[in-house]
Amino acid sequence: MDTMKRYIIAVLLILIVSACGKTPINGDLDGRWQIMKIEYASGEEETPERAYYSVALHTINLMQVGVTSQTGNMEYTGDSLFAEMPVSKIEDLLPFGMNGTEQRFGVKGLTSKHLILQSDFARLEFRKF
């Protein structure tokens, strides 16, 4: 009988621990990324202040502290990231290195601390925040 109680307690503990939270589906991409530099295809460079991409599950949030916050859908396939911002205006996306409400980025570099995205419009360099 004592063994049965221990078995039930062990099963309950395993269920409780495994039920906590959602696991990241995007690997190192999940989290908040601060934009360190934007290099436009025209050759111009920009260093935005307090601008971030936040990625979780299939959602992307673009935020510039005290200025704007834009939310959309994203799909990550390992070597590319496709962002769709259906309710955003293009002028609200420009400070984030996007020139349209649908943007495909090539993932040129991704570690747990650094991210480099490349589109036909701009190259973005991030650090994990």
Locate each region found by the language model:
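C-terminal motif of bacterial Sec signal peptides marking the signal peptidase cleavage site
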Residues: 16-19
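An anionic, turn-rich surface loop/hairpin at beta-sheet edges
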Residues: 83-108
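N-terminal glycine/threonine-rich, aromatic-flanked beta-hairpin/loop signature
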Residues: 45-88
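Bacterial signal peptide processing site
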Residues: 21-23
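Sec-dependent signal peptide recognition
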Residues: 5-11
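Tryptophan-anchored aromatic micro-motifs
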Residues: 28-44
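Short, exposed beta-strand-loop hairpins at the edges of beta-sheets
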Residues: 106-125
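Generic short beta-strand segments
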Residues: 34-39, 57, 84-90, 120
